[in-house]
Amino acid sequence: MTIENDYAKLKELMEFPAKMTFKVAGINREGLAQDLIQVVQKYIKGDYIPKEKRSSKGTYNSVSIDIIAENFDQVETLYKELAKVEGVKMVI
């Protein structure tokens, strides 16, 4: 199965506007949450309060951001753009 197929299935199943949480796992570094918020605000304006949780050894950080997407293109774009942020390992 390809990413394009996954996006096509997701697009069929979703209804908009849709409340979603993006969870991003990355290397623990100063400014990670702020960098992620800047990306989200570029595509969906609003005030966001990220929830952060560090790994037990402090190596990794997970950041959750709640959004309301107006269309599937916003969702697809955020998955791709959040993955490009320095230190990001995974976007869920």
Swiss-Prot record:
Q: Which Gene3D superfamilies match?
A: 3.30.70.260
Question: Which residues are the signal sequence here?
Answer: none
Query: Domain of life, per the record?
Result: Bacteria
Query: Looking at the UniProt record for this protein, which Gene Ontology cellular component terms does it annotate, in alphabetical order?
Result: cytosol
Q: Which InterPro entries match?
A: UPF0250_YbeD-like (IPR007454), YbeD-like_sf (IPR027471)
Q: Which family does it belong to?
A: Belongs to the UPF0250 family.
What protein am I looking at? UPF0250 protein HI_0028
The species is Haemophilus influenzae (strain ATCC 51907 / DSM 11121 / KW20 / Rd)
